[in-house]
């Protein structure tokens, strides 16, 4: 009996070890980095983007070209930063740092999708930019929006489909109106899945958000985000999201699988700013063993 008990004990240990291996921490050293750039967009809304008199790129978009297909070159983004910083497009004043790089890496296994962002956060937002007014006053926030294929043009326009001229902090807009997707609905899968890490203040009070954007942005209700973790070393932030592949539209959680290409965008708030006073990426795609600007590696 003693031998059997020992055998079962060893067998149980082996089972536990196997389970640990199945959910082992991702090995990021084996994952290629894709550098993208995030920039301060000012009051540039989706309506502005689609107006030919203000944005000549509208023609390319109507023909099926993506924003990044036009604006990204070998040297980075080709955009008119002086125009974005001018009073017409940033009436409260632009940050000193208009653009900065973010490295993106991604892994997936049989259960989870992992996305890691690495960046150095500037702390030079305009003096009149809106900032956190309650403790903890989060010094940095990093968010990812994952687009549903049911959102028309999500692969082309990225998160700009949620940014409209009538949302809060836009000139003359309703101060209570949040980001939204036109004709958005959870049941039909017409929404953006939204996850965010918030740093807290002075190393305390970090938290995470698992929400979505339909007829408005909702910062709760999601169940797919396992955890969002962040650390800062020598001024460089590393933020890692662990999210289940499985989701449920009722919770605002999209479902992902190998062979899928996912539209996504990145937004970084620095210097305790809120609302539109952030740096955002163009729309990119994440490929899970599929074509994409960023390749998610299977581990």
Label every PLM stretch briefly.
Residues 1-10:
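Bacterial N-terminal signal peptides that target proteins for export
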Residues 9-18:
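Bacterial N-terminal signal peptides
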Residues 18-24:
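Sec/Tat signal peptide C-region and signal peptidase I cleavage site
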Residues 25-55, 133-137, 141-198, 248-299:
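Acidic/polar low-complexity flexible segments
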Residues 53-68:
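Sequence/structural segment immediately N-terminal to covalent heme-attachment motifs in c-type
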Residues 64-74, 163:
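The canonical Cys-X-X-Cys-His
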Residues 112-119, 237-243:
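Short, well-ordered beta-strand segments enriched in hydrophobic/aromatic residues
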Residues 176-232:
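Long, low-complexity, polar/charged, intrinsically disordered or flexibly structured peripheral segments
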């Amino acid at each position: 009996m003693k031998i059997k008990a020992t055998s079962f004990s060893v067998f149980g240990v082996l089972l536990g070890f196997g389970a640990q291996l199945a959910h082992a921490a991702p090995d990021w050293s084996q994952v290629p980095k894709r550098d993208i750039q995030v920039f301060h967009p000012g009051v540039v809304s989706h309506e502005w983007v689609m107006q030919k008199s203000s944005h000549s790129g509208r023609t390319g978009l109507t023909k099926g070209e993506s924003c990044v297909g036009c604006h990204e070159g070998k040297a980075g983004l080709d955009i008119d930063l002086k125009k974005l910083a001018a009073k017409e497009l940033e009436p409260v004043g632009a940050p000193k740092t208009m653009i900065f790089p973010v490295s993106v890496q991604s892994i997936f296994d049989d259960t989870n999708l992992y996305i890691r962002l690495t960046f150095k956060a500037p702390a030079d937002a305009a003096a009149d930019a809106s900032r956190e007014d309650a403790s903890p006053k989060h010094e940095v926030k990093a968010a990812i929006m994952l687009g549903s294929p049911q959102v028309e043009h999500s692969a082309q326009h990225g998160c700009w489909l949620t940014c409209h001229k009538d949302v809060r902090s836009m000139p003359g807009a309703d101060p209570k109106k949040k980001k939204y997707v036109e004709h958005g609905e959870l049941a039909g899968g017409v929404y953006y899945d939204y996850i965010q890490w918030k740093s807290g203040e002075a190393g305390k009070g970090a938290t995470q958000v698992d929400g979505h954007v339909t007829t408005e942005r909702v910062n709760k209700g999601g169940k797919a985000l396992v955890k969002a973790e962040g650390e800062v070393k020598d001024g460089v932030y590393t933020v890692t999201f662990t999210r289940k592949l499985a989701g449920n539209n009722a919770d605002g959680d999209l479902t992902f699988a190998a062979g899928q290409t996912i539209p996504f965008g990145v937004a970084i708030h620095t210097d305790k700013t809120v609302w539109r006073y952030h740096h955002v990426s163009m729309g990119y795609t994440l490929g899970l063993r599929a074509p994409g600007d960023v390749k998610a590696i299977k581990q």
